[in-house]
Amino acid sequence: MADKRDNKGELRWHQRIALELLWGICLLFSRTPEWLRFGLLQSFIRLVLRLLRYRRKVILKNLRCSFPEKNEAEIRSIMLAYYDTLAEVIVDTLCLAGATPERDGVLLEWENYQEHIEANRGRDWIAMASHYGFWEYYPLWSWLDKDALFMGVYHPLRSPVFEHLYRRLRNLAPNIHQVAMADTLRFYMRHRSKERTTVLGLISDQSPALRADTVWFDFLNQKTAFIEGSERLALKFSIPIYFVEAERLKPGRYRARFKQIYDGVEQVEPKEITRRYAEALEAMVRRQPELWMWSHNRWKHTPEKQREWYGASTDDAQA
């Protein structure tokens, strides 16, 4: 499923209608002024999330386990602030429709982007991002480096309608190709070129499938499994890796920078690059915890479950 550019032939007629209705709604919201987006609309969505107590038990459990040093009032304050973030993410997603550099170039400010482009001119590199702030803004990088091929690696959605909708929302530029995670290596091997830089963008903080060789790191006070795909690619092809560090300036406005965690040539121990990513992510989450995706059941797998299923555990990767 490597970037079929919104091939509606895969959908039934009623799914096509649903897709176009949703796209029309997104286009409508994308043309609203900021005071309406982040005033009335975001406030309404935030109210709905709070009234529905959206994934409240999961959020509170994750926060309590991650920050045992915080009291209950502080935990609940972060939860309410997270609902604000989630409402903003929904608004920002709706408003991605029809995005252009002229209209939306100010949404994400990249620090030292020109120096970064020059430093990696003619060299492929990996951007390891996370579900922090509004991660759907990160492909806006493609507007700054128009000569590069941007691979947006993602997990396909179960709903074909929303799969097509999100692919359309993310097609922000001709040099963006959305690649299903299972097709990453195949697509990269087919399209890598000495004539052009290829940027692999990966959201790397999801919970991986539990396997016998799943490795654990100390992260936010808990044993946590991490996806190792970026590290394997980097070591196989000698590609540098950059952690995407972000901060929110105000609703709908972010600043991001690239922090190198592997230069493509350093001799490192197994799992070391993934460990550096986990450490950088934890430091960022602790600075503004309300910006991370706490409603995801991130710790559904444990070393104990690994031992139960496979008879052994690679507990903590000797971290």
Predicted segments, located by residue:
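A broad structural signal for alpha-helix termini and local helix breaks/kinks
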Residues: 32, 52, 66-68, 146, ...
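Hydrophobic (often cysteine-bearing) scaffold residues that line and stabilize catalytic clefts
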Residues: 75, 158, 162, 273
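Membrane-anchoring hydrophobic helices of lipid-metabolizing enzymes
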Residues: 2-129, 134, 163-169
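A conditional alpha-helix N-cap/helix-loop micro-motif detector
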Residues: 106-110, 132, 159, 181-182, ...
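Catalytic core of membrane glycerolipid acyltransferases/transacylases, capturing the structured
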Residues: 123-182, 209-218
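Non-catalytic C-terminal accessory region of glycerolipid acyltransferases
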Residues: 2-5, 76-80, 119, 172, ...
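Short, flexible loop segments at the rims of nucleotide/cofactor-binding pockets, characterized by
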Residues: 101-108, 175-180, 219-221
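Soluble or luminal CAZymes and related metallo-dependent hydrolases
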Residues: 17-20, 55, 180, 272-276
